[in-house]
Amino acid sequence: MKDFDYIIIGGGCAGLSLAYELEIHQKLENKTLAIIEPRDEYKRDKTWSFWKIIPHNFDDCVKKSWENFSINVPNKTKFLECSNYPYQSIDSGLFYKKVVDRLKQNKNINFFKNIDEINSKNSFIFNSVPQLKKNNNDLWQHFCGVEIETKNIFLMMK
């Protein structure tokens, strides 16, 4: 069993973001980090969308950004501007490639599929795995959609 200074349980968006920030801000110098993630490989498997309220280090992973939107109800449309807090979508494939490529450059960062492979007794542990309760009434938000691009929306309305 290997010993590590830090362990991140969950190598999804939250866990990898934490590891990336620690790495780029040189908080892992002379420290070891284990990332526990059961997947065999990182590949594009989702899109994360959010309101950008603070700067982040993943602008190069943003696939789409909106600075205005509309709310439509029968017989009425309200157009809103949100340039101070744009709505952004990050492509997980771009994110994974950027982050995993950077983390693998550090020989003190290791990926594991199972926590049983490491000694966690003297480690500082970050757990990003959600503890989902059975039969709770919390909102779990998912989107499924299609993005359609046209040259001019008014041509479609003729």
Where are these regions (language model features)?
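Predominantly flavin-linked oxidoreductase catalytic cores and closely associated redox partners
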Residues: G11, E21, H25, R102-K158
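Beta1/beta-strand and adjacent pyrophosphate-binding region of the FAD-binding site
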Residues: M1-A14, A34
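A conserved beta-strand/loop capping segment in the N-terminal third of enzymes
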Residues: F50-K113, N119
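Nucleotide donor/acceptor-binding cores
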Residues: F4, E29-T32, S123-F124
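Conserved Rossmann-like nucleotide-cofactor binding loop
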Residues: A14, E41, Q131
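N-terminal FAD cofactor-binding segment of flavoenzymes
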Residues: S17, E21-K76, L94, C144, ...
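Generic domain-boundary/flexible-linker signal
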Residues: R44, C82, N136-N137
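Anionic group-transfer/hydrolysis microenvironments
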Residues: I7, R39, V129-P130
